[in-house]
Amino acid sequence: TSTGASTFSVTLGSGAGTFTSTLTGLAQGTTYFVRSFATNVQGTSYGAETSFTTQTTPTVSVTATPTSLTTISAVGGGTISSTGGATITTSGLVWGASTNPEITLSTKTTNGATSGTFTSSITGLTQGTTYYVRAYATNYLGTSYGPNITFTTVTTPTVSATATVTSITGTSATGGGTISSDGGAAVTARGVFGDILRLSDKG
């Protein structure tokens, strides 16, 4: 919210009739109470009190936790809970490797959402990488951001051990391993692979 006057008074010429005045130097997002007045030699009279609220930057109350994570993409979103009284010109998501990403980055989406909840695809990511994402909305007074949310893209599983083969007979044996990380996605297949040649020699 910008700084500005907490009170003001405007004097405009003289004479009876209808008049208008431009009120300047006000603070953004502030409610003011106003009365018109007229003065003559007998004193000052006032019109009925009315109020107005100046416009401000939008309010982005939510950055959604990204879903549908893959190695290179995700789906995120946000909620614009207030337009600030002015038209939203652009909104979307912005992300990066550091906290508090801003729209000066090229890694952002541009949506047509002007209020409420929206979703947006996050693309061009690197697997197994942690990102920070914020929803944003812009009007002519500036840009506001939602909270920081972190997410990590999917990567291949981590197999931390191959078990020692046991129960060896002439035609069978028992093998196994340990999967210490699923890489951020469900493991759809697992097992033991073998050959009569050293696997490291096969390239």
Please give the residue ranges for each predicted region.
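Short, surface-exposed linear motifs at loops/turns and structural transition points
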Residues: T1-G203
